[in-house]
A protein has these predicted regions:
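Terminal amphipathic alpha-helical/low-complexity segments used for targeting or macromolecular assembly
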Residues: 1-82
Length: 82
């Protein structure tokens, strides 16, 4: 699945490459290339610059800190994730 396809399902806004391939979901601290993770709690912001995830699901109020991964913005990343 691509970020584009996932963003359409979640009604989210894409930041980055819409063709980024996603093959799994993982917690941000354990994610690897091909995974998507989410940031729904401020305490996980520290992982944003360290994660190996290919994409992150973030809130509409969050400003992405990286340009090498894709992001999907939604109103509630946690609800979108589950």
């Amino acid at each position: 699945m691509t970020i584009q396809e996932l963003a359409e399902l979640l009604h989210g806004e894409i930041i980055g490459d819409p063709q980024t391939d996603i093959r799994g979901i993982e917690k941000i601290e354990y994610a690897e290339a091909g995974h998507i993770a989410f940031i729904a709690n401020q305490k996980y912001l520290r992982y944003e610059t360290q994660t190996l995830a290919s994409a992150l699901l973030i809130s509409t109020s969050h400003t992405p800190q990286r340009t090498d991964i894709a992001y999907i913005r939604t109103e509630d990343p946690y609800d979108s994730f589950v």
